[in-house]
Amino acid sequence: MELIILAAIIQAGLIFLGGRKINFILNYGTYLLIFSYLLLLYVSWYNKDLKGIKLIALGIGLNFIVIVANSGQMPVLLASLYKAGLHDFVLTLKEGTYVTHTLITENTLFRFLADVIPLSPPFPDPSVVSVGDFLMFYGVFSLIQNAMLMKENN
């Protein structure tokens, strides 16, 4: 559990401190993001017997592949950002200082694994997600559902 929290703190810190253009984060954020994904993969492996973890691990793995293949940043489709109504985020990504994400270009590898699926209003939190994100969402749902059913049976 502690490693999941550490990975979340690293990723949140990258977004928060990167947005403030902290040089250390801008220079080493890629490595920190990759490290956070390695932590999540380790936790998934360690807990592989729990229902839903394999889907979570697959989602993390797919996101990890596209991030590593694209210089340590998750590519995002510009058209999907507009469809989701995330116009301000487009401007942020065009600046090129956002540590964890970048816009898809002609050089982007594994585009089909990138953040290309818009979740627009009326979705409560408009965003753009990847296939890996959906697998993780479903895996977490399955994990929670299984835990609730086990508790109910005891």
Question: Model-predicted segments: where are they?
Answer:
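Extracytosolic (periplasmic/ER-lumenal) interhelical loops and adjacent juxtamembrane/interface segments
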Residues: 78-128
